[in-house]
């Protein structure tokens, strides 16, 4: 299983958001959960003047958390990533995350 990091594109494989994809905003390693952009939104009620970011208060919609076991890393073409390693591509100077996919059976 590929390690999930902030900024990765993931697909939800279980739960009420199953089949949807999004970008990881935060990884909560201690809790075993991730926050995915625009998925599992929760409503928070905030009093007026409690936050500099939202001085008017009101009802905020924030991304909730999803169990890390319920998401899977997908590549740029929306296909699942099977193996991943850190290394250099041919001719590249910087290290990057290289992804390998399972070969298609014929």
Curated annotation (Swiss-Prot):
GO terms for biological process: translation. GO terms for molecular function: rRNA binding; structural constituent of ribosome. It comes from the Bacteria. Keywords: Ribonucleoprotein, Ribosomal protein, RNA-binding, rRNA-binding. One of two assembly initiator proteins, it binds directly to the 5'-end of the 23S rRNA, where it nucleates assembly of the 50S subunit. One of the proteins that surrounds the polypeptide exit tunnel on the outside of the subunit. NCBIfam families: rplX_bact. HAMAP family: Ribosomal_uL24_B (MF_01326_B). Belongs to the universal ribosomal protein uL24 family. This is Large ribosomal subunit protein uL24. The gene is rplX.
